[in-house]
Amino acid sequence: MKIYGIYMDRPLSQEETDRLMSFVSAEKREKCRRFYHKEDAHRTLLGDVLVRSVISEQYQLNKADIRFSAQEYGKPCIPDLPNAHFNISHSGHWVIGAFDSDPIGVDIEKMKPISLGIAERFFSKNEYSDLLSKHKDEQNDYFYHLWSMKESFIKQEGKGLSLPLDSFSVRLHEDGRVSVELPEHHTPCFIKTYEVDPGYKMAVCAARPDFPEDITMISYEALL
């Protein structure tokens, strides 16, 4: 299992953008051009090329030759490499990629003030109760802690919106353990959180608990 992070400390230059665009599909190039905000295009582009870079090094392929598809519920995959599982998440200044030989999910969220009504709407009753039990000053932080863990689980499952957020509970125990409560869910899954930035929450969900201790940082230059 490998987890990589790109910190976008500056916008991509036009030269860097053109170089990265040369690796991706025509459909992805068009998608990037349609974004209103350049930052959204840059995050999407960096995520795509991050996957290509990691997979190309692992399997000795050219980055531009890798072809992506989507599973039944829309999770990206590489049909020619069924054991090359990956997942991408981006928010704010961060692009994160997680890679493993089994299904994996990752989520990073830039924190901002939230309404408890959002938690009541999307969280399970147990999660909402856990949130309300926190001191008011801790609730925003705990909300994003839960949200990132729940999203990482949904992305690891690969079922998208067919698995509602309130259909399962993620519980963070006092000893640091994380458990997922979902009726009739028998597939092993493990969740680890990472503190990559004070203003963000990040979580990875995998089929095995052998998570790396830290993420590996990747520069723009390493992708070119």
Swiss-Prot record:
EC number: 2.7.8.-
InterPro entries: 4-PPantetheinyl_Trfase_dom (IPR008278), 4-PPantetheinyl_Trfase_dom_sf (IPR037143), AASDHPPT_N (IPR055066), P-Pant_transferase_sf (IPR050559), Ppantetheine-prot_Trfase_dom (IPR004568)
Top-rank lineage group of the source organism: Bacteria
A single cellular component GO annotation: cytosol
Region of interest called Peptidyl carrier protein binding, as start-end residue ranges on this chain: 158-189
Disulfide linkage: none
Enzyme class per UniProt: transferase
TM annotation in the entry: none
GO terms for MF: holo-[acyl-carrier-protein] synthase activity; magnesium ion binding
NCBIfam families the record matches: pantethn_trn
Recorded family membership: Belongs to the P-Pant transferase superfamily. Gsp/Sfp/HetI/AcpT family.
Protein name per Swiss-Prot or TrEMBL: 4'-phosphopantetheinyl transferase ffp
